[in-house]
Each structure stands twice: as C-alpha cells, then as structure tokens.
Amino acid sequence: KNLREEDLLQSCRTAFSGGWSGVKLYFMLGLPTETDEDVLGIADLARKVYQCWRECTPNRARGVRITVSTSWFVPKPHTAFQWDAQIPVEEYQRRVNLLRDALKRDRSITYNWHDPQTSYLEAIFSRGDRRLADVLEHAWQNGAKFDSWSEYFDFHRWMDALSACGLDGDFYAHR
C-alpha cells in the first residue's frame, strides 16, 4: 500500500507514547514474486513494533498486544495482478507455517491467518466465467446458504458442485 516501514514504526511510537497497548498488522501472503525472505520480514517488522513499544510506553506493566494477520492473495480483475495465479494451497500453508514458526517464541505477538478454503473459492469466482453460474445453482440446491459465515461454510459442497458441473477450480485459481 505504499507505506514506508519508518512511517509505520513512527505511527506505532506515537500510539504507544499516547498510551495505546495494541497494534494490528495485516499482510497478504502469496503475492507474485514473494520470497521466504519477504515472509520472514513480516516477523521482523512485528518485532520492530514490539521494540517501539519497549522504547515508548510509559507503563510497561500493562503489556502489549501485537496481532499479525495474513490472508491468501486472491487475483482480482482490473487490478495489477489480475493475470497472476494464486499459489497452491500447499505453498500457502508452507508460508503460514514459516511465519508461525518465526513468531512462535514472541509471546507478545499473536499470529492469525485466513482460512485457505474460502480464499481458494474466492479466487475461483473472482476469475470465473459464465460456467460458474451452474456451480452456484448446484451448490445452492445442495444447501449452500450464508456461506460467508464460517459456521455455514462447507468447502466440500462447493467442490462437489464444481465436479458435478465438470469444472476444475484449479483452472480458475491457478492459471
């Protein structure tokens, strides 16, 4: 988003100096050209935010909550990356594990990641065509309702609908 690291850290210093005790950092995994070094850079940045808290907070007894959240890159039409493929779920999970392991020892840093199944389905429909209309109808006829709510989401229902319509989700998400 064109935000310099120093600008982010200065904002954290200002917030911590003013008594704030929590920061949430959001990132996307799986962007084109991303490397393991980039993924580990997220952990490094979170640690730098923690250092800002240590340097600036007037009352360390309260503690600090730094939350790092990641989602899986979904290529969308009319964006700079519309023609780039979504990385396979196994690669996304490997990167999640890499970051989780890098943050494991940092008690003040919590790591959350987005469910890969919903992101995969989002990529399919973001890059889909008219053939997916039949998939939508089939999934709906088989009980898909309120699927953006995690308690109602059934990934297998959607995969069954794709299969019943003779379509492969990877064709849309990973091409």
At which residue positions do the language-model features occur?
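Conserved non-cysteine loop/helix-boundary elements of the Radical SAM core domain that shape
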Residues: 1-59, 80-91
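Metal-dependent DNA phosphodiester-chemistry modules and their immediately adjacent helices/loops
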Residues: 12, 66, 98-99
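Short, compositionally biased low-complexity segments
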Residues: 14-21, 67-73, 165-174
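A glycine-rich phosphate-binding loop feature that marks nucleotide/adenosyl-phosphate handling sites
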Residues: 28-31, 59-75, 111-126
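Gly/lys/ser-thr-rich phosphate-binding loops in alpha/beta enzymes
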Residues: 89-102
